[in-house]
Amino acid sequence: FHRNTQIQEYENFKKLVSSIMKSMSELDYYPEVFYSRQLEDIVYSDGEQVLPISFLSAGYQSILWISMDIAYRMAIMNPHHNSYHEIPGIVMIDELDMHLHPKWQWNAIRALEENFPNIQFIIATHSPILISSCKNEHLIHIDDNHHVDYPQAAYAYSIEDVVEFVQ
């Protein structure tokens, strides 16, 4: 084993996280996430600067940790798969919108679905922006009495309309 030997699972992991961050930020390039021996930490590089993840905003950290956690668990539970796109599963996330800039709230579900196409995401939220970013078939409303409702289409509704009609 040589220090510079590439490990395919690690390379796939880095590529996936990079793709999610590109989707979230609507970038024209793929940022990098990798372990820096020099800093002895996981770092994020946007091409201009390299920063430890702990130096990033809470929103960046939140999406990075969620993405890395999903990818790690998928790799451990499915060692025979070479692509994250092939792996089916169910992932539950509570309050995905926590710490996220409104633009990132809008992009979050799409970015996850694009990068994990065979994963069913069950996401609990109170964010009207996150709700407005969903297509109708993705929404289920459960009230305090556990009554289940399938609200009308909320895609691209204003925040006020989502609060009034959906929540």
Say what each PLM segment does.
Residues 94-95:
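Walker B catalytic acidic pair
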Residues 90-91:
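Hydrophobic "anchor" residues on beta-strands that sit immediately upstream
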Residues 1-61, 65-86:
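Extended helical coiled-coil dimerization/tether regions that scaffold
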Residues 98-99:
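Short active-site loops of ABC-family nucleotide-binding domains
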Residues 106-167:
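C-terminal lobe/lid and adjacent interdomain/linker elements of RecA-like ASCE P-loop ATPase modules
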Residues 102-103:
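Helix N-cap at the start of a conserved alpha-helix in ABC-type nucleotide-binding domains
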